[in-house]
Amino acid sequence: IELGMGKKFKWLAKIFAFFGVCVGLFGIGTFSQVNGISSAVHGFFDPNDAFTVKILPFLGEYSWSVVIASLILSFCVAAVLIGGVKRIASVSQIIVPFMAVIYFVFAVILICCNITKVPAAFATIVTAAFSPKAITGGAVGSMLIAMQKGVARGIFSNEAGLGSAPIAAAAAQTNSPVRQGLVSMTGTFIDTIIICTLTGLSIVLTGAWQVEGLEGVQVTTYAFQHGLPFPAQFSSFILMLCLVFFAFTTILGWDY
């Protein structure tokens, strides 16, 4: 910001850096990712809170799976971050493609197993978006809620409009800014157009979006359990593994 807009905008660069740290630490960079990992692990190993521990009186009780997962996560993040950008890159370039391919394969299997429902699923998506109920709801004030949810989902999906992409692009070691720009755009395309579309379609195909009482990770878990031709426990394990490693690499990138 300082080099591009001039030294008189140095204050703006400092504000950008401050809020970037806040978002990375208290927002989508760390806290929400840790919560996602804890929810996934808790839902798989101890969904009924059969074993709980009390760390401090004012913190309440937590499932043993959450405590152990948090300790392991802290150790792994520290071990990678101490190695600097090279270790982060070497770990991420192994984990991210591997887990993306696994998630893609299982999501495609789910869709193929329910291929006859795909036309109806797309019809449901379109009709629900443009139904009189949706239009009326928007007219009476639900539009603001829809926009809020949409912006939140968009930021969590690919961080569009957040301003975080330049941070990662600036840290990249490349001789071609054009190539780096293409890499940044490719990441957004893969994340939103491919991964998120597969996830949304899986949720609609299995009817997980209509099940009451499910939130967040639980919705996708239900879709994988009921849509894949594998034992429910195995499907849940695959999803948990993907979520844990995706969130782990996100923490590495933001904390660095």
Task: Indicate where each model-derived feature is located.
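Flexible loop linkers connecting adjacent transmembrane helices
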Residues: E2-K8, W209-L228, Y256
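Helix-loop junctions at the membrane interface of multi-pass solute transporters
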Residues: A78-V80, G154-A160, S164-P177, S184-T188
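Select transmembrane alpha-helical segments in multipass membrane proteins
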Residues: F9-L25, A69-I72, A134-S157, I194-L198, ...
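Hydrophobic alpha-helical segments of multi-pass membrane transport proteins
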Residues: A100-Y103, L110, S202-T206, Q233-Y256
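Helix-loop-helix module between adjacent transmembrane segments
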Residues: L3-N35, S39-V80, F234, L241-T250
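Extracellular/periplasmic helix-exit of transmembrane alpha-helices
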Residues: F106-T124, I135-G138, A171-T174, T186, ...
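Re-entrant/interfacial helical elements at transmembrane boundaries that shape
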Residues: N35-G36, G163-A172, S202-V204, Q218-Y222, ...
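Membrane-interface loop-to-helix entry segments
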Residues: F16, V34-V41, W64-N114, V118-V126, ...
